[in-house]
Swiss-Prot record:
Family: Belongs to the type-II 3-dehydroquinase family.
UniProt cross-references to CDD domains, sorted A to Z: DHQase_II
Identification of the protein by name: 3-dehydroquinate dehydratase
Known EC number: 4.2.1.10
Species per Swiss-Prot/TrEMBL record: Halothermothrix orenii (strain H 168 / OCM 544 / DSM 9562)
Pfam families: DHquinase_II
Gene of this entry: aroQ
Amino acid sequence: MNRVAVIHGPNLNLLGRREPEVYGTKSLENINKEIEKRANNLKIEVDIFQSNHEGEIIDFIHDNYKALSGIIINPGGLTHYSIALRDALAAVRLPVVEVHISNIHKREDFRHRSVIASVAVGQITGLGTEGYLYALEAIVNIIKKGSY
């Protein structure tokens, strides 16, 4: 069975409370339950991880990539400047789908650039928390095709 990591970056632990007009009212716990349910329907295993610390996210990738078939990541604020996270994702040579709940291209100028996008097979942005579920379906198809 394929195993996919779903990584939530900084401040995503505050979903449901943080700027609900931008990110909605679902808590991270509820989002994770939806992810687990969809993964079960798709017959894949998911490892869900959240950290507010760049190094912990990189360590998680390093420590787990050999058991993974792909990575779904919402890097949060790390999207715009974390070359170290970008390099960690590139180094493990797995398909990566980048997810953003809000449309980063409709927000402040500094949010328009993603350093992660260049190592991702695709990016889902602005479709709310459903973006995680679309990413699961996409990564399953990418893994089946074996090309990324």
